[in-house]
């Protein structure tokens, strides 16, 4: 599975925060999807693209995990 996350550069999120987010996503997703590749970059808008998932249910599960990681900001500390 491949995850592409684009963060709007106008949000002024530091590279260390993006690195921490990437690490936390790997920590939560790799046990379920060992071949996961995540790319987080800054761009002109916010967006998420998931590829390599067969079932819509898998896509929903991954999005749910990503949402949980984003909302639980304990990984920032």
From Swiss-Prot:
UniProt keyword list: DNA damage, DNA repair, Transposable element
InterPro entries, per database record: DinI-like_sf, DNA_damage-inducible_DinI-like
Pfam families membership: DinI
Any one GO BP annotation for this protein: SOS response
Gene3D superfamilies tied to this protein: DinI-like
Superkingdom of the source species: Bacteria
Family label: Belongs to the DinI family.
Protein name, as recorded: DinI-like protein in retron Ec67
Origin species: Escherichia coli
Lineage: Bacteria, Pseudomonadati, Pseudomonadota, Gammaproteobacteria, Enterobacterales
